[in-house]
């Protein structure tokens, strides 16, 4: 299967990536999980793709759902056997604490960058912290 993934939210932050992959499993739907004040999350339709030894979860709906271990369990992936798990999140890695030997934070370009000054602000009242120097009161 050749498919375009990602890059659909805002073309300013990246374009879709063409992948040639094998469909490993189809699933998704609603998950009952107590997470960050939510009692459940809905992935919508989801597919697990394989590109060589790499597994990629692609979901219909955006959100935090793909950042919970129950999603891997849903697709019969044992996290204890994984050499590496990459999450598209800056904070939800805590759910993986029992499997973590190392956390490597990566600040990728796009709408979730930690470098707020690099975002294309257009209608932002100035000055505003942390983008501008603020006068001491």
Over which residues does each language-model region extend?
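C-terminal catalytic subdomain
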Residues: 1-50
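Extended hydrophobic packing segments that form well-structured cores
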Residues: 30-137
């Amino acid at each position: 299967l050749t498919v375009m993934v990602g890059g659909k939210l805002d073309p300013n932050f990246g374009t879709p990536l063409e992948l040639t992959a094998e469909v490993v499993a189809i699933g998704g739907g609603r998950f009952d999980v107590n997470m960050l004040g939510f009692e459940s999350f809905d992935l919508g339709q989801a597919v697990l793709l394989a590109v060589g030894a790499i597994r990629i979860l692609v979901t219909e709906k955006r959100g935090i759902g793909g950042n919970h271990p129950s999603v891997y369990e849903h697709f019969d992936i044992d996290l204890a056997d994984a050499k590496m798990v990459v999450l598209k999140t800056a904070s939800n890695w805590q759910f993986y604490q029992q499997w973590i030997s190392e956390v490597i934070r990566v600040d990728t370009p796009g709408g979730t960058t930690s470098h707020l000054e690099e975002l294309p602000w257009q209608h932002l009242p100035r000055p505003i912290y942390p983008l501008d120097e603020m006068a001491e009161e």
